[in-house]
């Protein structure tokens, strides 16, 4: 966990050697074709993850309730959402689908046991929207346009300055922060706008530290 202090001496040193990860192209292409043709054909795939990792209260602190996250999944022409969530995500996706939301859960992919297959699933997506968990690191390592819904209880890697709107680890990862007073409302609004604008690559400062 402390290797970065020896390898990188300044914030500007991060993010210069991307992509850090590469998926198997044949598996990536296969999954993408299947997902786009699932039901009514779609044009774009957005990977999603709403539950954080850890133990006990830490999971709750990093997560967004499914009924709240569903607000982000309201239909956008040509867009299909793909669950990248590890753990027992199937029942939640089934509930969303009953509500008419276009979300896929691929039961063949277990991120906790099949990391290579899961990474191909992430790479099959055009963009990713996720809370801060392994999904962010997979998407960021691939260089996929990503928006991180960042909890107030985030750790040192993300900085706590609200002026920081992009990850210095992964230049393709933007940050929408939970706020002390407003909760998730402003971050959710920011995320929905990002989705409707086609999930552009993020811009903005990666640090409030002097260069």
Over which residues does each language-model region extend?
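Catalytic machinery of carbohydrate-active enzymes
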Residues: 1-211
């Amino acid at each position: 966990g402390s290797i970065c202090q020896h390898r990188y001496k300044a914030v500007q040193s991060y993010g210069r050697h991307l992509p850090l990860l590469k998926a198997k192209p044949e598996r990536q292409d296969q999954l993408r074709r299947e997902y786009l043709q699932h039901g009514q054909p779609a044009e774009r795939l957005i990977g999603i993850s709403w539950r954080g990792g850890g133990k006990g209260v830490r999971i709750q602190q990093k997560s967004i309730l499914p009924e709240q996250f569903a607000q982000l999944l309201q239909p956008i022409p040509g867009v299909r959402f793909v669950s990248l969530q590890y753990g027992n995500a199937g029942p939640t996706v089934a509930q969303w689908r009953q509500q008419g939301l276009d979300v896929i859960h691929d039961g063949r992919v277990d991120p906790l046991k099949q990391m290579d297959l899961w990474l191909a699933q992430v790479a099959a997506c055009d963009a990713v929207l996720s809370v801060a968990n392994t999904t962010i690191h997979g998407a960021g390592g691939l260089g996929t346009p990503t928006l991180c819904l960042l909890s107030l209880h985030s750790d040192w890697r993300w900085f706590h300055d609200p002026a920081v709107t992009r990850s210095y680890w992964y230049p393709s990862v933007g940050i929408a922060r939970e706020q002390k007073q407003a909760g998730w409302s402003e971050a959710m609004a920011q995320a929905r706008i990002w989705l409707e604008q086609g999930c552009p690559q993020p811009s903005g400062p990666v640090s409030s530290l002097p260069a």
